[in-house]
Amino acid sequence: LKCNKLVPLFYKTCPAGKDLCYKMYMVATPKVPVKRGCIDVCPKSSLLVKYVCCNTDRCN
């Protein structure tokens, strides 16, 4: 699986066990991602922070 880094021009190949790509952003500024990368379990979103997870190459 390949996941985009914070700047989507770059990506990395995820290590074994991290089978999801994720994008995290503040609810107040949804167009500005704060973090992107590989993750094993999708975190729960909160009132301030939203997580979007997916499982295809560079989907984040």
Swiss-Prot record:
Main localization of the protein described in the UniProt heading: secreted
Gene3D superfamilies registered for this protein in UniProt: CD59
UniProt name for this protein: Cytotoxin 10
GO molecular function per UniProt: toxin activity
Keywords assigned by UniProt, alphabetized: Cardiotoxin, Cytolysis, Disulfide bond, Membrane, Secreted, Target cell membrane, Target membrane, Toxin
Any Pfam family: Toxin_cobra-type
Compartments where located: Secreted; Target cell membrane
Function, in words: Shows cytolytic activity on many different cells by forming pore in lipid membranes. In vivo, increases heart rate or kills the animal by cardiac arrest. In addition, it binds to heparin with high affinity, interacts with Kv channel-interacting protein 1 (KCNIP1) in a calcium-independent manner, and binds to integrin alpha-V/beta-3 (ITGAV/ITGB3) with moderate affinity. Has hemolytic activity towards human erythrocytes (EC(50)=0.162 uM) and cytolytic activity towards various cell lines.
Subunit structure: Monomer in solution; Homodimer and oligomer in the presence of negatively charged lipids forming a pore with a size ranging between 20 and 30 Angstroms.
GO cellular-component term (any): membrane
Record family assignment: Belongs to the three-finger toxin family. Short-chain subfamily. Type IA cytotoxin sub-subfamily.
An annotated GO BP: killing of cells of another organism
Summary of the tissues where the protein is detected: Expressed by the venom gland.
Cysteine pairings via disulfide bonds: C3-C21, C14-C38, C42-C53, C54-C59
